């Protein structure tokens, strides 16, 4: 999604340079990111209540989100309604996952720790991006895409492992020895995804992209933040079993 979106932004700039009042600004990205995160958090409540008790519904939501994400990635730019609907679906999954994660460990305080860790991760990635190394890492899209696809395949295989009771209900993540390593890999990839999204937003703003791209960037940033939260929560839940 990141590579295609950045290419579309660059194409839009080449085809038609927007007027100054129609150019993307930092407040535009902040507002859309906050809106997408807010919708996701609100949607997490029914996800926590209604979806966590049925693994079949949760699995259906994951599959639906995958196809929804592919559809959204092909839209350029993403409209506000589409970004908010996608964020709501992501929030449902976040709520269901959160309930199941603390259910495994029985410690709701882990959610607070994961939220604090997510805030720290966002601040940390902003600090990393301010360095020359961080800017280079944010442009390593092809390497990230390859690793992300591999991690997605692992996630699909892990669903099968969960169905067979591997790792005490956590799949490969719950296997002693490699479980925490896989969790740490997930946290690292989510943080890298956030770094790439920060870089794309900065490039779009500096390049004078049209304001219509604010929802695409905000949705992408919010998705990476939610992903980072979920990976941190999984790491904490398994580490505290």
Task: Give names to the regions the model predicted.
Residues 1-241:
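A hydrophobic alpha-helical transmembrane-helix feature that marks the membrane cores
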